[in-house]
Amino acid sequence: MSYASVSAAETGGPDTAYDDAKVKAAARAQFISFAIDDNQYGVDIMAVREIKEWSNVTPLPNQPEYVRGVLNLRGVTVPIVDLRRRFGEGLTETTPTHIVIIVRSGEQQVGLLADRVLDIVAFETEKIQPIPRTAQGAASDFLSGLVTFDDTMIALIDLPSLFVT
């Protein structure tokens, strides 16, 4: 006599609803949305370490023009990237209302200079749309996709591509 192994999911048993919930949870994404001028961008919330007010940075020689300098964050030297400049839109004229989003990209922490944080947005990953082929310009090189949230288009930043020179 042989016995076949059958999972609860195959039989429609009690674990089916739990498995469906796990799949749905895995297919959701959360992003911190923020603004640069009138444009909205998002960065994966799992990469965000903290958000802090703008403070002066120490400029370093021979850095890419979009690196504003470095700051000391609890003993860790963190380079600060001016996203406006990285996107080819000129230097950010910083004020005390600007913010720095500290993210981890690979093994390095990096600060992203932005105008303001807007919200935490959650959506199904299937709602992420590709960047249109007609999109030209520096900013589109650093985006992984677009998502519409509450009638607003949010451009999702691909962190690794920001740091490729």
Locate the predicted segments by residue:
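An acidic, low-aromatic, low-complexity terminal/linker signal
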Residues: 1-165
